[in-house]
């Protein structure tokens, strides 16, 4: 970070955070009356009742719903285009992403393509994308059931182009969620290995954002607190997934790390992992980051010594007047 930083801060998302706060969905002012609810192709949203709880809260708010349930762990362009076409045909006026980062990222991309012509990759600014400007998008509501991506508080969405084998992040001011509800009670069913992978994703959002050249005073505050919370509470959440205090602390750390992404940036570690999981879509994103991390951070050890020391200081002070 520069000695005399100049920066701007723009996070237009309303955040509702806390155990049991999913109930606020029935009373919040919502951006429309017909929603496409986007979930993964897995079983957990229905098995644990999360989908029905969200649909019930939306009904109480006089919102009609459709469910799109094909999203993969590494979401693909084909599904974005298919769901966007459904949005247009059914005249949905906002999109709800319910689940992990893949569902919420997909909801953001669907919201873009519901309002813009052409192909999704026309708007992506990397690889074979054409970088067309996005002029409008449907409003987005994010309801995470995992703690890792922080996508509920940033504009970024990561989608895979299967044919080109490209996995690229994209975002703009229009892809910030309008409303995000982070309820740690929706996260207690995550199995230990996924809790760990997702927690490390949040850790690397914070650590990368802290060493990035574009780090800001506000992103530093978010990053260091996220690192402290993850170091202290991720082992607890992995060992005991029903521990709501640990789940809440990791959920807050993930949200903070998402705010790091909105006020600083991930570094090339994330880009390297995106290339890995574009070729190997079964690879969990967090696991790929873990595999890269030792060699990656060793490479920058001498360039970021003071920043590394500050992160270490936050970790070694665990237990000293911190909660």
What kind of feature is each model-predicted range?
Residues 1-94:
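ATP/NTP phosphate-donor binding region
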Residues 148, 255-286:
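Glycine-rich phosphate/pyrophosphate-binding beta-alpha loops
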Residues 279-282, 286-320:
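Gly/Pro-rich interdomain helix-loop hinge
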């Amino acid at each position: 970070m520069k000695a005399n930083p100049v920066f701007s801060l723009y996070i237009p998302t309303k955040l509702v955070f806390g155990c049991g706060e999913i109930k606020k969905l029935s009373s919040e002012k919502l951006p429309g009356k017909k929603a496409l609810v986007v979930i993964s192709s897995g079983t957990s949203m229905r098995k644990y009742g999360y989908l029905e709880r969200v649909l019930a809260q939306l009904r109480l708010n006089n919102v009609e719903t459709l469910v799109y349930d094909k999203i993969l762990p590494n979401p693909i362009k084909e599904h974005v285009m298919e769901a966007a076409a459904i949005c247009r045909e059914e005249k949905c006026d906002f999109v709800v992403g319910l689940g992990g980062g893949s569902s919420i990222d997909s909801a953001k991309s669907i919201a873009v393509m519901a309002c813009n012509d052409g192909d999704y990759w026309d708007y992506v600014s990397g690889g074979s994308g054409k970088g067309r400007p996005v002029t409008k998008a449907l409003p987005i509501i994010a309801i995470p059931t995992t703690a890792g991506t922080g996508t509920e508080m940033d504009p970024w969405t990561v989608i895979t182009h299967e044919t080109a084998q490209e996995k690229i992040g994209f975002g703009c001011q229009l892809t910030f969620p309008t409303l995000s509800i982070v309820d740690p009670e929706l996260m207690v069913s995550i199995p230990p290995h996924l809790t760990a992978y997702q927690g490390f994703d949040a850790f690397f959002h914070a650590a990368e954002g802290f060493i990035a050249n574009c780090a800001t005073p506000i992103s530093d505050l978010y990053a260091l607190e996220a690192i402290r919370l993850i170091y202290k509470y991720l082992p607890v959440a992995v060992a005991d997934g029903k521990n709501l205090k640990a789940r809440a602390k990791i959920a807050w750390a993930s949200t903070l790390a998402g705010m790091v992404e909105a006020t600083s940036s991930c570094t090339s570690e994330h880009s390297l992992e995106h290339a890995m999981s574009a070729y190997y879509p079964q690879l969990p994103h967090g696991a790929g980051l873990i595999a890269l991390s030792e060699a990656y951070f060793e490479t920058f050890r001498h360039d970021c010594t003071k920043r590394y020391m500050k992160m270490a200081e936050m970790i070694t002070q665990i237990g000293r007047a911190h909660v």
